[in-house]
């Protein structure tokens, strides 16, 4: 299997292209500053992952920005801090401020020359439109949790994407699903029979940060630590 075997790269957005962990920690700072004990970055992210994953299972049709507001309130309760709904709703709106990784735009612009590009993201349409400005590339297809009515790792999200791609004349064998999260993406993508590329952004930190630990460690077909590394590997593949 070679990187040049594929017609389309389907990307997770948050955690892969957008640095959601930095965005979350920054946006939660007014809340965590009021917690009596000192929380590490990973303690904040792991608590967020627990509440977010549970809420996505309970209310799969709720828009992501609204779901984040509920997560904010759950975190405040867990940490014993009073928090208003105004604060919680502001946190839900913070998605627009989450930064892109420094290598994202350049790598996407390079890859766009050789592949069709698509997004499969646990987000609402309005929030993704704001993040998309930071990605600086035109995607051939965008599939959001809001449109699908469920959140990854639901198999429904991958079935939906594959059905839409089939309508674009793209076979499953021509798709390389590219993502950071083993839990949200690689486990269900592997179950769906997709080839996968792991952008292991957390290679230096270890742990799972803002994502849950997968039930099993899925096999991945390609592994890189950044989008820049993926683009470089593609250049090398072209040279043979």
Language-model features: locations:
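Asp-based, Mg2+/Mn2+-dependent phosphohydrolase catalytic module
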Residues: 1-9, 37, 83, 105, ...
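N-terminal helical cap/lid subdomain that shapes the substrate entry/recognition surface
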Residues: 3-102, 113
């Amino acid at each position: 299997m070679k990187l040049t075997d594929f017609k389309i790269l389907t990307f997770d957005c948050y955690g892969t292209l957008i640095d959601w962990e930095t965005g979350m920690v920054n946006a939660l700072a007014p809340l965590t500053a009021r917690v009596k004990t000192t929380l590490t970055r990973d303690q904040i992210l792991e608590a967020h992952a627990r509440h977010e994953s549970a809420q996505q299972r309970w209310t799969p049709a709720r828009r992501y920005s609204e779901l984040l507001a509920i997560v904010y309130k759950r975190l405040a309760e867990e940490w014993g801090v009073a928090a208003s709904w105004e604060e919680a709703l502001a946190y839900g709106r913070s998605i627009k401020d989450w930064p892109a990784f420094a290598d994202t735009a350049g790598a996407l612009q390079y890859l766009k020359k050789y592949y069709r590009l698509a997004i499969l993201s646990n987000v609402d349409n309005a929030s993704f439109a704001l993040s998309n400005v930071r990605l600086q590339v035109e995607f051939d297809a965008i599939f959001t949790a809001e449109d699908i009515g469920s959140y990854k790792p639901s198999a429904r999200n991958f079935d939906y994407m594959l059905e839409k791609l089939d309508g674009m004349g793209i076979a499953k064998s021509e798709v390389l699903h590219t993502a950071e999260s083993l839990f949200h993406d690689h486990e269900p993508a592997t179950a769906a029979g997709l080839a996968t590329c792991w952008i292991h952004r957390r290679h230096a930190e270890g742990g799972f940060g803002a994502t849950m630990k997968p039930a099993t460690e899925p096999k991945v077909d390609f592994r890189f630590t950044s989008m820049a590394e993926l683009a470089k590997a593609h250049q090398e593949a072209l040279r043979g």
